[in-house]
């Protein structure tokens, strides 16, 4: 019930609320809040609050009610007092219903479940508690451990602190020790340096000792050689004495035989027999005597055994007129005598040759030996020049009895006795005429002409005399008999068989004939190739020599054949050396061994005058063979020598003589005047000549043919070729044919003979080499040309694949290469190793050969096959363009250039690995070259190249871009800038593909730095050396910071800037042809471009600008041509832009001052330009720059006198009043914004102009001080660098010498003009800036100098000297102040001064040769004045000085302690002239004059009286000297009338003594002279010294040399001197105590005077 009631309560409570709400709504419709009163509002508020509280209460009641309803619904069924009972009752009441379930869960089960849960939770909590306890225990353990660790940490920290303290102490100790050790190290280093210095000294001493020891060793070896020489000479003398003994024995036996024969003759005469035998017997007996004594009759007095002799007249007449009949076999005595003589004389010669390899001394005094291998033709090898002179001296006495001395000692045929002692004299004067006849008969026929030099083109004439043919066999039998006897003992020892065609010594000489031959130079008788030899005279009477039996025959050897007629041995050729004349006019050939050059040049052929004995041929002609000689009765070349007969070539060539004995054709009596008889086909006597009886048979014909071809014996070869059945193609063991041997040795005539005889032209040896191969390899281009003409196979390859072209390239034979290429040979033939001719040419490094291979046959506008490689002179900008090979395309294909051998190496690999840069450069010019081609070891050309070649390869594809410096627009020419250049090329930049912008920027910066250093350095060293030699003093202040911008073509670029493309691609794409560097100029407020243009250091220009900005009034003055106008205008321009950059407006006003420029015009200029403003007007802000040019043309004091104070104090406090044109005057003043600059072309101020000096700031441009002193040198250096495209030529280059000469001319001119006391004639460097720089043409510079001299220098000097001579004269002599027309004396002075200046300052040091210089001297005005009027040149003949220019010292020279030097007291005059003068007081008494006499004879002594004025008298020469003296040293007047003419040499000058300026200093003459003194402005007393002995020329008065006196010659004199009487030798001078003398010393080197002695 309660529930029901409870549930009804809410409904009951809602009803009144709803009723109240309904009434409220009804009331609200009529209710208006705004109309309520305050109390009503309060009541309303309270009602509403109560309503809210009621609402809260209702809410709470509703909540409680709902809670009760829930509980009732949930638990209302049960009795709360006994819930279990109620449940049981309810259960039991419904027990019948089995399916009935409890209403809710049993509370007991719920409790059990709760208890179970609680137990689980308890267990879980217990486990967690146990775990927590264990964790707690662990934590406590860890805490304990942590505490222990902390304790240990504290202990360790304490230890660490202790250790740190200890370490600090150790470190301090170590620092102290280091300091001590460093000190010790320094000490040890010093000691080491000392020890090293001592070591260097010891090394020097050791080196000196080594040099001394080596010198001693050389001396000892020389002494040893001399001893050996003497021993050999003693052996020779011993053998000669033995020979003499043998000859005496033989002579005895001959005399016995003659006695017997004479007895028989007497018997025959008694019997009345026929007279013919009686006529022939005396001749025969004479000849027999001659034979028996024919070998070595000279003994120790002659050099040659088989020497040509001149017979006595009787003997020679017999020889000429009668035929000679000789028995076939000689008598035993004769043979024995000959054997003994030869045996005695052969051995010492050979021994001596073995001990002295250089037996080739000069036997002709007029022919100095060219080398140790020189071969003397006419006799001994070891002879000395005195032999000839001694022989010539004894010739008159020796001629009647023996041979002429020249023949005896110099022109004998080759003999074993060629090594005679040096003291050889003519043969024994007492020799029997029969001995001479015998010598002539069997030896003298060595005069027969040599056959080597003749061609077979024209058969010579032959003697058809029947007598000669009939008697040929008999004479030859006789001679061959003697030959057999002689040849036994003139041969080498048995078993020493020589190589065929060569001598044991490896040198085969060409032997000219013996007889009256004369030496001539090769050029005299040289004929063009192909000319036939001239036909010789047939008559003996044509001989022009005094010896009757020797008709002279002149044979001109063909100039086309090589003179090395022998076989080539050891790669040496025989060349002709310059011959000389013998006393009797005999001509021989001298030859020398020359090393084989890479491109052989065959020497010209000498001409030989051959004299032939008509009576027959000499024994020695066959017994002593040579190159081209024909050995008679000798075994074959390859057979060993035997006792009976042997080859004699080793004996003759062992002495390296080059006497040509006669070969076979001249062995006929009738063929004495025919050289190539058998060449014409007629040789009737060949068989008896070759096969005459003897102990050994002759060798086979083929061997003899090869020997003749190898030796170049044309005559023997022609005879052999005329034989029938001879195999001319026979080959020896090596496969060498006769044609091969002749071609290999360069015997063109033999080659032509063999080819005409149809020899096989392509016959190859066992290695496959043809004659063409041999000739090409040896460089015999004439043989090559001949073989090619006879269709030789030009592309024949030997067994190794070598073609003639390959062999010629391998040996560098340029002419042969050219001939083969012209013949169309194949360049691409490869050897077995894969090498081509290009490989061979590159392997030897022969540039000419490679050029021929590359370019020969190219279509040619630029084909220069035979031209030299263009010199890498100036720069590499145009290397490829300037070289002519670059203009023509190579003819070889790319495949041939890139062909690789078996190792994979191309020609470029070979050239690069061997460092042949020139060859590699030529190869690189071929566009098909593949430098990246790799060999079999995978190496490129760059990998195997040397450093130089690597650099070349790296630059192969590099772009060469010229780098130029531009200074922009140069101001108009009236500013003095006509000679300046806007752009200068400084170098070439190599831009490669891998070049980065950083590299490019560094290269530009480095090039600029090098260039600035190069042009500012003092010397002529190269650009690479400037970094080491440049000093701060010579630096002009330019660097990379001076660059305003850089233009790559037309694209601007700044240093360090990186573009998208690489520099290489950028340059190629934009087609930039140059890189231009723009320097900062006045437009940027900088002066860098002005510095570079004018070469004035930047620091000095900045100082000038600072002076202008600071002082506002600056005047620049210096000699004319000192660039004052240019400097002023550039400074004004820079100042203007600076002011404009600062925000001011600025204007430049320029005015040229002339003689008519007045002060009123200047006032108008100042006022119109707002520089002068009225006092009432406020100052203007505008900047005005006034430039007054050429102020020297007006008086400064008159022009600027009224402006001095206002200019110095620029304010209204110092006004100046000027009258206007309307007559009114007004006050003006100069404001602070006005700058005044002026220029004066004058070296110094004078007179009233000095009053202006203190009111201006002056900039003096001295010619001998910076910036003018080094300006010209720097400017010309820059000009030279620009001319040579950025490169600095070598100091020894002629261009550098020319530039140095032009520079010295300017300096010496100014130096001499300053000494002359004419500062108004001084020249600035501007006149010399246009000096032409023309490489290789110094004449252009000399011509330019002559024009400058005539147009500028000479007129200025003339005007200055005349102005000096026309200054006011003293009134007592009636002289006018000026002279419109100079007198003759003054004209002479001008001419003399011009001549002296020209010779001493201009022509001195000229790089032209003296001959060319003499031609140009006439172009100089005043150069023809005779210096003998001024100086005495007679001593030149004694001193040998007539052609030498005297040197001039232009540099300031300090005073020596031995000269007395007064101090000048004129400070205002310290700005001009030479800084130092040597002022000396001379004691001119007799002894002093004598001591100075020589120096006064040689030099121009300008010792002058400067207080006393000189006058011109009637004598022009005296006037000239005196006036020139006053000109050269004095600023004072040289009065003409002061000096009277005196006949004697005594000239006395009185000291004026009235000059107060020098009165104080005269008493102290040893006071030092200031370096800034100006001696030309001072006054001195003139001292003259001369010598009477030196006469110049007839008609000229005695005028002494007034050239500069060396200081070493000047005698210091005492101050107190007395007048001495004049003598014939000296002029005595009276000198006062107060007089001063000046010595003008122009010698730069005083040792010249010593040389003149």
Curated annotation (Swiss-Prot):
Which residues does this entry mark as bearing Asymmetric dimethylarginine? 488
Q: Name one GO molecular function term.
A: protein phosphatase 2A binding
* Cross-referenced Gene3D superfamilies: Ankyrin repeat-containing domain (1.25.40.20)
User: Which ranges does the record mark as transmembrane?
Assistant: none
- What's the domain of life for this entry? Eukaryota
Gene Ontology cellular-component terms listed? actin cytoskeleton; cell cortex; dendritic spine; FAR/SIN/STRIPAK complex
Q: Which PROSITE patterns match?
A: ANK_REP_REGION, ANK_REPEAT
Question: Could you tell me where the Low complexity compositional bias lies?
Answer: 390-408, 1614-1628
What InterPro entries does the database record attribute to this sequence? Ankyrin_rpt, Ankyrin_rpt-contain_sf, Cortactin-Actin_Reg, Cortactin-binding_p2_N
Q: Which UniProt keywords apply?
A: ANK repeat, Cell projection, Coiled coil, Cytoplasm, Methylation, Phosphoprotein, Repeat, Synapse
Each ANK repeat occupies one of these ranges, namely 700-730, 734-763, 767-796, 800-829, 833-862, 903-933
Per UniProt, the ranges with Acidic residues bias are 866-883
Location of this chain's protein in the cell: Cytoplasm, Cell cortex; Cell projection, Dendritic spine
The annotated region (Disordered) lies at: 1-27, 203-222, 268-297, 314-339, 356-609, 860-892, 1441-1472, 1545-1653
Which spans of this chain does the record mark as coiled coil?
A: 119-276
Provide the primary localization: cytoplasm
Phosphoserine PTM positions read: 1514
UniProt KW Cytoplasm keyword: yes
Ranges of Polar residues composition bias in the record: 379-389, 444-470, 478-490, 573-584, 1549-1564, 1572-1589
Task: List all Basic and acidic residues biased stretches.
Answer: 1635-1653
The record describes its quaternary structure and partners as:
Interacts with CTTN/cortactin SH3 domain. Interacts with STRN, STRN4/zinedin and MOB4/phocein; this interactions mediate the association with the STRIPAK core complex and may regulate dendritic spine distribution of the STRIPAK complex in hippocampal neurons. Activation of glutamate receptors weakens the interaction with STRN and STRN4.
**What does the UniProt function comment say about this protein?**
Regulates the dendritic spine distribution of CTTN/cortactin in hippocampal neurons, and thus controls dendritic spinogenesis and dendritic spine maintenance. Associates with the striatin-interacting phosphatase and kinase (STRIPAK) core complex to regulate dendritic spine distribution of the STRIPAK complex in hippocampal neurons.
Which PANTHER family does the record cross-reference, listed alphabetically? CTTNBP2 N-TERMINAL-LIKE PROTEIN, FILAMIN/GPBP-INTERACTING PROTEIN
According to UniProt, the name of this protein is Cortactin-binding protein 2
